[in-house]
Amino acid sequence: MSRKPIIAGNWKMNKNPQEAKAFVEAVASKLPSTDLVDVAVAAPAVDLVTTIESAKDSVLKVAAQNCYFENTGAFTGETSPKVLAEMGADYVVIGHSERRDYFHETDEDINKKAKAIFANGLTPIVCCGESLETYEAGKAVEFVGAQVSAALAGLSAEQVASLVLAYEPIWAIGTGKSATQDDAQNMCKAVRDVVAADFGQEVADKVRVQYGGSVKPENVKDYMACPDVDGALVGGASLEADSFLALLDFLN
């Protein structure tokens, strides 16, 4: 079945509010119709108000880069999914390898966050991916499959069909190494197969799976040609308006 592509830029810990506003103003009027593709940027928490406000009359959607699994309470430094929804965010990225690695997030944390995000009417972009060691040991499919199953446990079939999964091999994030087209296709298909096993083929046919890891305007077309790759989660190439817009040339 045909799934609408989704290109999401992850700014990570970059841009101040003025830079975020300038970026949105530079890209907003040049984006293709939402009939063709969903386009989003994941802004740091300190930029979300400005980014959402700047994007509100355009087709650009806005993601938070993380949230907590409780709506309110004594959780110093955390971001409420309820408030993200009230602010007008569309998506929340969860389970990024940087969060898992540097901030010790577990599969259980990510699962709780996914449930909290849905409870507040937002859509999770759930990241998964393996280290170079796991990849070279030939255990990538098994490892990533376990991450996906754990992240989605207890969600409804309808919820899973509507979310976004982002496969990002850790060895390809910001390293300049990118997975081959075959790697990306095989792993994104493996992710979809896990969804099929856990929730049925109909759900697996609907869920969108992104590839992430050194995606650039020069290679995005190759990845987007893969039958099981429905989009890209893009880091470095999403920081400049021109390179971000160039990522959408795969539509032509």
UniProtKB/Swiss-Prot annotation:
Compartments reported by the entry: Cytoplasm
Domain of life: Bacteria
Keyword terms of this UniProt record: Cytoplasm, Gluconeogenesis, Glycolysis, Isomerase
GO molecular function: triose-phosphate isomerase activity
Pfam family, one: TIM
Active site residues according to the UniProt entry: H96, E168
CDD domains per the UniProt record, alphabetical: TIM
EC numbers for this chain: 5.3.1.1
Family from the record: Belongs to the triosephosphate isomerase family.
Protein name as it appears in the record: Triosephosphate isomerase
